[in-house]
């Protein structure tokens, strides 16, 4: 079982070498466990990496659809953290995470198109690096700061609910995580009247 493997990792240093910028998994301490049928089962919190090494030339050579999905997933960080925490009095760490979430959207909007264009050309650029760092590092740090279940959990709310719902629908597996989460972002923005 994956949790048993995670328990082994808790005792060892963990170094991550992401080859794509599709999510924050290499920085966050959150692991998602799925049922054999592909539906969401639970979150598991083994530990976060001691260090994450990112080589821009490897990211620039990765599949375009994974960067696109990473942008879609990262766009959820601000709207979900702000929405999920708005009724609570936040202590230092989750408050810092929510504030950090507010800077995750800007690089994606400002540099996202150029980053995708450069990735299509397998070109390392400032824009691609900024978007990759935002997807992998910034959102991962936010996830670690806003997720201390059962005390508080502001990491995934409405946008990710759309994704988790898709895991129990026929054909849901044909879509990338960030692709569906980006639809959830639109739902979250509409629900919170920020659209």
PLM regions and their residue ranges:
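Active-site segments that bind and position negatively charged phosphate/pyrophosphate groups
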Residues: 90-193
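Alpha-helical architecture
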Residues: 16, 53, 158-159, 194
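A glycine/threonine-rich phosphate-anchoring loop and its flanking beta-alpha core
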Residues: 10-101
